[in-house]
């Protein structure tokens, strides 16, 4: 492993970028604000690795924030894309590839009987909220503290991801009237949800959540929590929506709803289903989805929705994921990684708790367990920043925020896991004092 990496070109390019783009980035967490140090400018990726513009190689545990589940630039995906691009980049009209990916999603995800493709997870969540309200005739929605459903105005209330990373309470520019119907509760707290329903009779359109929180760190549902939400929403004539933009096709082929055996009414998807290209989707029961235009009155549209390149990458990625043993391998790889991380911290007397499910993991530098966003905020963020910088110097690229989950891929081998655990040993030893 490299002791001191040269970031000269990254520094030069990022300095120029700050004069061209707000903060020098196209998405806030990339600016390293919460961890300090020099943001890395990447040049190329392949398998489990990423190379920066200075030629430094990293073992990557971000995976483009989740989509690269088969490894970066998988040859079957890139070959399929090369063939598809010869036919054009976008049609702005129906194409048979939409049918094929739709069939695959419907076949895999228990709640989805019909699906609409969009261009991002944010778009999917915006559209699904409009649909929830139209179907129920109610305006209010319940979300959970620290859960992130994109940057649409109505969801920027106690949000996770970059909002949590930057320590923002909400966002300026969002009128109070826009979020007046957004109710919040602590994750894993059924009693708080019951109270909201009792205080707002016949007014709540539904509950939306990340079934596994990945945008406030990595927080799993306690036994009975998802089941309880299913019962509460049904009893109150409301809809249950799983935001599986992150967990869909990652923790199992059918997502969190398959893993936990709880079927929502509607589901949002993204990341993995685009194979690394911009994509989003929302789907659910036919009686609800039939309200979406042009079948029904709920309007939603997109110039590049269902474009042939994203559909091609998604189809090929799902074909790879459907092969036998895929999720067993992800689970084995990631379990070994998180066990090694926790053991390394404990060996150095550093408080830690964490976990993993399939190809998704996370840890907090604090005593656990962490069951919600308030408890996640007890994480030692200063220590995490030091850890991140030490790991970067050892060629390991972690999410530059303690409030983001990490990801493994099918391309991560035992060698990469061994190198990573060794780097954690060295890094924890370096920062413990």
Curated annotation (Swiss-Prot):
SUPFAM superfamilies: PLP-dependent transferases. Signal peptide: none annotated. Its cofactor is pyridoxal 5'-phosphate. Keywords: Chlorophyll biosynthesis, Cytoplasm, Isomerase, Porphyrin biosynthesis, Pyridoxal phosphate. It is found in: Cytoplasm. InterPro entries: 4pyrrol_synth_GluAld_NH2Trfase, Aminotrans_3, Aminotrans_3_PPA_site, PyrdxlP-dep_Trfase, PyrdxlP-dep_Trfase_major, PyrdxlP-dep_Trfase_small. GO terms for cellular component: cytoplasm. The modification N6-(pyridoxal phosphate)lysine is found at residue 271. GO terms for molecular function: glutamate-1-semialdehyde 2,1-aminomutase activity; pyridoxal phosphate binding; transaminase activity. One of its GO terms (biological process) is chlorophyll biosynthetic process. Its EC number is 5.4.3.8. It is an enzyme of class 5 (isomerase). It catalyses: (S)-4-amino-5-oxopentanoate = 5-aminolevulinate. Pathway: Porphyrin-containing compound metabolism; protoporphyrin-IX biosynthesis; 5-aminolevulinate from L-glutamyl-tRNA(Glu): step 2/2; Porphyrin-containing compound metabolism; chlorophyll biosynthesis. Belongs to the class-III pyridoxal-phosphate-dependent aminotransferase family. HemL subfamily. NCBIfam families: hemL, PRK00062.1. HAMAP family: HemL_aminotrans_3. PANTHER family: GLUTAMATE-1-SEMIALDEHYDE 2,1-AMINOMUTASE (PTHR43713), GLUTAMATE-1-SEMIALDEHYDE 2,1-AMINOMUTASE 1, CHLOROPLASTIC-RELATED (PTHR43713:SF3). Homodimer. This is Glutamate-1-semialdehyde 2,1-aminomutase.
